Amino acid sequence: MQYWGKIIGVAVALLMGGGFWGVVLGLLIGHMFDKARSRKMAWFANQRERQALFFATTFEVMGHLTKSKGRVTEADIHIASQLMDRMNLHGASRTAAQNAFRVGKSDNYPLREKMRQFRSVCFGRFDLIRMFLEIQIQAAFADGSLHPNERAVLYVIAEELGISRAQFDQFLRMMQGGAQFGGGYQQQTGGGNWQQAQRGPTLEDACNVLGVKPTDDATTIKRAYRKLMSEHHPDKLVAKGLPPEMMEMAKQKAQEIQQAYELIKQQKGFK
């Protein structure tokens, strides 16, 4: 009920013997209370909507990416399951993710329409959009390589989300560098099992994670590090609409950034 504040305000004014002007004042104060309460309720409703859309769209687009290569294989499904494991998805949340993945695999999946809807709901929250794209890039690279069809789909996603080709290519380099810090891809062994593809991080990998060059000075590197840590702060992302189920991935990404920064400091000799 959006008028309890007014009722209480008027009742208090009458009990205190405030007369006509007391009632008017109580009504105005109650009205302000009702408006504030209404805005708060609307914020929570929008937050839930944003989180639900982020969750569903993430797995729908993941399914669409997988299908773009052709037939969805058992290995593809295994990779998607691994990602769900990383998010600690169980029970109803996991079932919802699996259903969304199947929706995305349909031949007539409206990718551009879905991305426009997603961008509209995440308007003004570039860090959310960035997190979404990073998850999709990670999923596309999960088998150790980027299929041309997957790249084409990712370009469409980036375009619809307002991300330039140059920004997208930088994201790719950052994700490739992050793979060496535990954020990564999978590769199939001779026995048919999947394992993380790691050769050990280099200075170049670390710089790619932060989006800087090995020749950049300490000030530039520190600025890039602080900006990325702020954009990937798990609590901030959840407050802006990241589903709580994906908070673990945000934490892992923040850890990659931290590890990359520590390696750069060690290699370049600054504090």
From Swiss-Prot:
Membrane-crossing segments per the record: 7-31
InterPro entries from the UniProt entry: DjlA, DjlA_DnaK_co-chaperone, DjlA_N, DnaJ_domain, J_dom_sf, TerB-like
Keyword field: Cell inner membrane, Cell membrane, Chaperone, Membrane, Transmembrane, Transmembrane helix
Outcome, altering M16R: Only partial activation of rcs
Record topology, Periplasmic segments: 1-6
Localization per record: Cell inner membrane
Keyword Transmembrane: yes
Domain J: 205-271
Chief localisation class: membrane
Pfam family, one: TerB
Resulting phenotype, L15R: Loss of activation of rcs
Membrane topology: Single-pass type III membrane protein
Gene Ontology molecular function: protein-folding chaperone binding
Entry's Gene Ontology cellular component terms: membrane; plasma membrane
Side of membrane Cytoplasmic, spans: 32-271
Keyword Ribosomal protein set for record: no
Top-rank lineage group of the source organism: Bacteria
Domain description: The transmembrane domain is a dimerization domain.
Subunit structure: Homodimer.
Cited function: Regulatory DnaK co-chaperone. Direct interaction between DnaK and DjlA is needed for the induction of the wcaABCDE operon, involved in the synthesis of a colanic acid polysaccharide capsule, possibly through activation of the RcsB/RcsC phosphotransfer signaling pathway. The colanic acid capsule may help the bacterium survive conditions outside the host.
Protein name: Co-chaperone protein DjlA
Species annotation: Escherichia coli (strain K12)
